[in-house]
Amino acid sequence: MFEGAAALNLDAKGRLAIPARHRDALLAASEGSLVLTAHPHRCLLLYPSPAWQPIRDQILKASSLDPRAASIKRVLVGNARTEEPDSAGRILIAPELREYAKFEKTVYLVGMGTHFEIWSEAGWKQQNDLAAEALSGDLPPGFGDLVL
């Protein structure tokens, strides 16, 4: 189970070092293969390959004749890349994906349970600001009984 957010720096080649606290669990869940893809909110998603496969299969079942479904397929499946971590636990983020997500030097790796989101520094700040604003009112369905 992946959780928590970490500010990380990409190296000069665009590689991201997976933090030690997540590395072993991610590599075990991934069977050595990770999938990076774009998300419609301009972040990237990082999945262990076995966790991505059923999601990909579900996406591919949608009709390509529906313009919205076709757009979702293009973003999620069309941008998907399989990557293998190097011996130092780094993964290469392709230039196209870095450009899509507007990455500069610092990115945020955000644990989302079964996978990670990877945000640009500006994108992560914006998401936190939007969340604070959205949560100042009524809670969304399913969160009414949540006790913190």
Swiss-Prot record:
One of the GO biological process terms: negative regulation of DNA-templated transcription initiation
Alphabetic keyword roster: Cytoplasm, DNA-binding, Repeat, Transcription, Transcription regulation
One GO CC term on file: nucleoid
UniProt entry tagged with the keyword Cytoplasm: yes
HAMAP family: MraZ (MF_01008)
NCBIfam families documented for this protein: division/cell wall cluster transcriptional repressor MraZ (TIGR00242)
The family this protein is said to belong to: Belongs to the MraZ family.
Protein name as it appears in the record: Transcriptional regulator MraZ
Classification of source organism: Bacteria, Pseudomonadati, Pseudomonadota, Betaproteobacteria, Rhodocyclales
